[in-house]
């Protein structure tokens, strides 16, 4: 009689052995989730504002030197959606964090004005789309990288139309 082998369904694990998938339903928001995203978004918003002040010097030099490298300096603005979605693994966390960061960076004043808020909404929606595709259950490096790449699409499309 042949021995039957049962298929195993092992979930992905990090190097430390922790699960990279959600272990319980993630639909409900707790107060700590809202506060975490609010503070994280505010901190990233201050960082975004600071980056905006620093941004013009290198960009001006790159416009003269080698313009295709200008995109490398846009990376920090794409952090909030991915980080928010990874830290608070709830539907809407990436969008919430990105919008809070955009609001905070807009309030002291930027050269881009209220368009920062539109950009933040588009970036948050891009990250949310990727997390939703994976059912808010996978949060590893591949999903985070894909979410970061997806942020660029809607924002690039919108800025190109400006």
What spans do the regions from the language model cover?
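Hydrophobic transmembrane alpha-helices
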Residues: 22-84
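Short helix-perturbing small/polar motifs within transmembrane alpha-helices
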Residues: 18, 118-161
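Membrane-interfacial segments
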Residues: 51-55, 59, 88, 92, ...
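Cytoplasmic membrane-interface segments at the C-terminal ends of transmembrane helices
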Residues: 20-33, 84-89, 128-142
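Hydrophobic alpha-helical transmembrane segments
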Residues: 34-39, 75, 79, 91-99, ...
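Short, Lys/Arg-rich, polar N-terminal cytosolic tail immediately upstream
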Residues: 1-28
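Aromatic-anchored segments of alpha-helical transmembrane domains
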Residues: 41-49, 99-109, 149-159
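Interfacial aromatic-anchored transmembrane helix boundaries in multi-pass membrane proteins
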Residues: 61, 65, 101-128, 159-160
